[in-house]
Amino acid sequence: MNWLIDSFKRFDKKIAIIDNNKKYTYKDLLDKIEEYLDCLKDKVKRGEVVAILGDYSFENIALLLALYLNKNIIVPITSTKESEIKERLQEANCDKKLKVDNEKLIIENLNCKTKHQLIKNLQNKNNSGLILFSSGSTGKPKAMIHNFDNLVDYYKGKKEKNINMLVFLMFDHIGGLNTLLNILSIGATAIIPKNRNADEVCKIIQEYKIRVLPSSPTFLNLILMSKSHKKYDLSSLRMILSLYLQYQFHLCQMFVKI
């Protein structure tokens, strides 16, 4: 049995995810994962490269974990531009494209004939994988492949905590997925914002007493410029997590002073 699934069974009625103001327990999440695993039977083979279209949602998180258990190579794609989606599907050598529409799982065959050697290596080891794309700010976005089993197992044995954490970074961002895995491994609650504007995020921080904010210097600047921090009580915040704050330490100091 998988250690993460064992943890979900133990967490049981604790709130795992709040999506669109609706609360889902760890039992709800486990039930949805099992539902998707049943849907994948005979339709998605182990080791196939599978894209998930869409951003964070209760359903997409359950689908991500179902594909992880099915030992697939997973490609989260949050873009809504058809040309960009098509390019990423081709670049990642995707076999299937999955989308949840009105709670119904839609599976589309892409029949990719070629596979990169790094994908073959994961398939030969019977490991799940994760393919993410660079931002493309300095040119064409580059595909990066990760061993998803290793990413998940990094969080094994973490101490259980009762805290609310905001899932801010995108579904196709390594920082966002690390945040999600950390939350679920410790039995905490992941709160998905309706959108990522400064007002909405500050409102959530106040409402759910958020203590940890995964963010970026750009977004912290937006909060300061919009003065959303003056409309809401952000005193619950204890930590700001970012890959880039070491280069923006003065900004972090300014934010702490508000």
Cite the ranges covered by each PLM segment.
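Conserved AMP-binding/adenylate-forming core of the ANL superfamily
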Residues: I5, K13-V44, S83-K86
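Conserved AMP-binding/adenylate-forming
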Residues: K22, D38-T80, M170
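Conserved S/T- and glycine-rich ATP-binding loop of Class I adenylate-forming
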Residues: V50, L67, S128, S134-S137, ...
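Conserved adenylate-forming
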Residues: P193-I258
